[in-house]
Amino acid sequence: MDPGSRWRNLPSGPSLKHLTDPSYGIPREQQKAALQELTRAHVESFNYAVHEGLGLAVQAIPPFEFAFKDERISFTILDAVISPPTVPKGTICKEVSVYPAECRGRRCTYRGKLTADISWAVNGISKGIIKQFLGYVPIMVKSKLCNLYNLPPQALIEHHEEAEEMGGYFIINGIEKVIRMLIMPRRNFPIAMVRPKWKTRGPGYTHYGVSMHCVREEHSAVNMNLHYLENGTVMLNFIYRKELFFLPLGFALKALVSFSDYQIFQELIKGKEDDSFLRNSVSQMLRIVMEEGCSTQKQVLNYLGECFRVKLNVPDWYPNEQAAEFLFNQCICIHLKSNTEKFYMLCLMTRKLFALAKGECMEDNPDSLVNQEVLTPGQLFLMFLKEKLEGWLVSIKIAFDKKAQKTNVSMNTDNLMRIFTMGIDLTKPFEYLFATGNLRSKTGLGLLQDSGLCVVADKLNFIRYLSHFRCVHRGADFAKMRTTTVRRLLPESWGFLCPVHTPDGEPCGLMNHLTAVCEVVTQFVYTASIPALLCNLGVTPIDGAPHRSYSECYPVLLDGVMVGWVDKELAPGIADSLRHFKVLREKRIPPWTEVVLIPMTGKPSLYPGLFLFTTPCRLVRPVQNLELGKEELIGTMEQIFMNVAIFEDEVFAGVTTHQELFPHSLLSVIANFIPFSDHNQSPRNMYQCQMGKQTMGFPLLTYQDRSDNKLYRLQTPQSPLVRPSMYDYYDMDNYPIGTNAIVAVISYTGYDMEDAMIVNKASWERGFAHGSVYKSEFIDLSEKIKQGDSSLVFGMKPGDPRILQKLDDDGLPFIGAKLQYGDPYYSYLNLNTGESFVMYYKSKENCVVDNIKVCSNDTGSGKFKCVCITMRVPRNPTIGDKFASRHGQKGILSRLWPAEDMPFTESGMVPDILFNPHGFPSRMTIGMLIESMAGKSAALHGLCHDATPFIFSEENSALEYFGEMLKAAGYNFYGTERLYSGISGLELEADIFIGVVYYQRLRHMVSDKFQVRTTGARDRVTNQPIGGRNVQGGIRFGEMERDALLAHGTSFFLLHDRLFNCSDRSVAHVCVKCGSLLSPLLEKPPPSWSAMRNRKYNCTLCNRSDTIDTVSVPYVFRYFVAELAAMNIKVKLDVV
């Protein structure tokens, strides 16, 4: 993570040179570094998880011990290895490695084999090591385990991938899946919180507490809280296997160290030696322990082990002390390795809790980015893998017990290898997690949610694809909250989260995106040398005594470890020295270290201290360090204590410490593609961030190798004439999303009201915004037959009259063939019976067969049973299709206007689009007006203008700049021209604003949404028309439609007709006397009578037939009456 290398060579301005370069389209020697950076957090976190992290996770799994035939058996996982994806052993093939393109095409999972070395021992004596296959786990594309790792673009193309393939996703059943980055509490940092809900946890509880999200090196996480009680004591709260436990703090402190009560008392009151209330509270906490007869550490451990062992599932031969040690290792400050460190951390948390309760320190905001980090894909993968490895050990014990019940099992290697195969397979749990995004865990992994962890990385267009890897979600549980505090954009997020790139609907403020310069720390470094460096700089070790009183010293914490104390006069100098070492790469201080000095203010503010963070999963961003003249990575917490300038004129000597690399560094990658976004109203930029991801563009270059369910393609994309410099930085011309259009702002017809727009029919005929949709269908004949039967293969019976030369000899359609509704689609044969089956094309939309891929099974031994047919559906713009500019100005195509009736300029130029001028005043999208002038001047002068935000100001006006360029080309300074009516040929009196604007066609098309039905299928139960466009269902007549008819006074006829006659009208027989719908039954006539002519109903309750009448009622009412009768509820009707 080099903070200085990435942003040094930003393009000074956009250019069209690369489009005219003869080498354009030839693969580079190396991939574009800027694009690879976008997925680096995903890829590098996974690399750490499957290499260093996997080794640490295996070491952290305790040996699994149990009793078997009066012997103590223990299993220990010594090592685990994940291998790159390969074909199964025994497969005959040239290439052993499996590549992602094959898994996409065959709709299978890109996965590697997980093997582990299991050591087994009897009564503590090692008996050997068994190498065991545990299952398959998904492999992230472009990670070190992927077969595409470090391949140059030419080699990637040869393996049917994009030249700029970025990776960062998994392939599950042929679908690309991304593990979503979630907001998590900052690890190993005590956060003071006030929550009224905590009062309900028990008698005497208050709303004050200190919470800590403890995370180990292998990312195992546990949440822990300290609660303040009304009597001044403190209760420790932790979670074990999703169960909440409470422990008085005194017991925890006494169990961790063998200190005397006086030493514990002295540690807890540091800095507040004269506070009588604190002294009494600490004395009371220690007195509670003494009252239980626990005066020594051993007695406390024995007491806690006896209380908790029933929940810990430890072996019976463990003494109570060992059970208590197991509890503290798994639940209390798990990020700390020694009990002494845990003791000092709990003391610090207690002091902070008392400061919060007494109003000496303010609460930390858990919704602020200062107290947050992100959950990376590698972190979730490693936590889940560790839990499943522990679960596998437990399943071996269960398999032992089952085997022992049936036969006499002896302990030897051969028997163990057989029993190991009976353990749980890790393949299905991983595939379930990635396929559904739902977490099945016994511990919860320290997460706040168990659903929505994975999303599909759909390639609707390249912008949408990029956004998946920069998205950060607050969490699914927060979406249900009624409060808006979690959605607010706080000042602390400046430079880390984009202020405009968030949805405008339900997930607004919950689904955010990282800025273009923001990075996620993924590397883990050992910090063993830093404590010694701190002591050399003047920090007093934790077991020493500072020269001044503790009230005038700051506590010093390094990654959640209490290192010592530092004099408040020395602290600023030490923080500056550490910052120098960090920027200059000296003293082995990592460049992503966060140095935070929270000063004493004498007022209720943040709890003071010197905090150092080097842990992964934090957000950092580069800024210019003005003192050293170099770039520095700063974190979210240290930023709030800095003075960061944006422009040069904002720098004040002695006050300003840092400066932004460029003004638009606060925007996300997608928001940086909006031209002149600083001239638009903020909501319009938000809309464009969303609509840019819905654009029908050019998402990839390997259409012939893809088997996605649906892909969009714009046939005639263009490079924008006006674009920000970041557009070129990310080489977006390789994946264009729109077309340069000549737009005239004029009310010319009545068809352009309410954001509608007129398109020149001649432009449409020349290919304006033409597109296609690629749909793929995966056909597997093995799903159509019974288990074990393999007699079905694709093919056709010669001379079959149903096919009529529509299909090839292999039973599949010809590539390039046009398909219509009812045409033969494919044919297959039963080899046993010789029977032929023909399936027909069922879609109402005509298509062209674009591609057919023949697939096989994992071993390559499958018969001709599986194909993937890709169809191309032409989708040229039609009335009702949606378009938008890059400024959130969306509208639908309302009319294709003949070119001879369109207005034209003096030079004979006819605009492509007529835009209603009423769309500007309320939307205030001045950026679109500037883009129109800039695009016009760019076309006239053969230039490509820079539309990067914040380059123009009131002093340096964009209107002046582009107006002068238009003037130099002989056009009006303000971008207006005289137009002539295409109908009358007369000159229009008003000056019309006309220019070039880059327009996008969105994926919302009438062809996908229109629905028409007269009569059709009905629901079997309610007899009402079924809903759904795919099944030719009815159109929903909802509450708004009902209210509209009521308001028009047509309830008697139209409303009755819609909701009754056209829905589920039925004629029912009712007894007028008893009012029952269920009692009238049809009497069976004598055999000699006609059953149709002599239909006679009789009331079974009244035993009369002259009281039967017919009424028209909804059929669903009859069903409702029958349901109530089943519940012993009678419905009586008054028939008038």
From Swiss-Prot:
Positions of region (Loop B): 194-208
Record GO terms (molecular function): DNA binding; DNA-directed RNA polymerase activity; ribonucleoside binding; zinc ion binding
Positions contributing to RNA binding: R180, D367, K890
Region annotated Fork loop 1, chain positions: 439-453
Enzyme class (EC, first level): transferase
Keywords, ordered alphabetically: Chromosome, DNA-directed RNA polymerase, Metal-binding, Nucleotidyltransferase, Nucleus, Phosphoprotein, Transcription, Transferase, Zinc, Zinc-finger
Residues bound to Zn(2+): C1071, C1074, C1099, C1102
Region forming the signal peptide: none
Domain of life of the source: Eukaryota
Region described as Loop A: spans on this chain: 236-247
Modified residues (Phosphoserine): S1051
Record-annotated site: Active site gating: Y687
GO biological process: DNA-templated transcription; neural crest formation
InterPro entries referenced in this protein's UniProt entry, alphabetically: DNA-dir_RNA_pol_su2 (IPR015712), DNA-dir_RNAP_su2_dom (IPR007120), DNA-dir_RNAP_su2_hyb_sf (IPR037033), RNA_pol_bsu_CS (IPR007121), RNA_pol_bsu_protrusion (IPR007644), RNA_pol_Rpb2_2 (IPR007642), RNA_pol_Rpb2_2_sf (IPR037034), RNA_pol_Rpb2_3 (IPR007645)
Ligand binding (DNA nontemplate strand): R1020
GO cellular component, one term: chromosome
Positions with a binding annotation for DNA template strand: R1036
Region (Disordered): 1-24
Subunit structure: Component of the RNA polymerase I (Pol I) complex consisting of 13 subunits: a ten-subunit catalytic core composed of POLR1A/RPA1, POLR1B/RPA2, POLR1C/RPAC1, POLR1D/RPAC2, POLR1H/RPA12, POLR2E/RPABC1, POLR2F/RPABC2, POLR2H/RPABC3, POLR2K/RPABC4 and POLR2L/RPABC5; a mobile stalk subunit POLR1F/RPA43 protruding from the core and additional subunits homologous to general transcription factors POLR1E/RPA49 and POLR1G/RPA34. Part of Pol I pre-initiation complex (PIC), in which Pol I core assembles with RRN3 and promoter-bound UTBF and SL1/TIF-IB complex.
Record text about domains: The active site comprises the fork loops, the loops and the rudder that stabilize the transcription bubble and assist polymerase translocation.
Family, similarity comment: Belongs to the RNA polymerase beta chain family.
Protein name in the entry: DNA-directed RNA polymerase I subunit RPA2
Organism per entry: Pongo abelii
Lineage: Eukaryota, Metazoa, Chordata, Craniata, Vertebrata
Gene: POLR1B
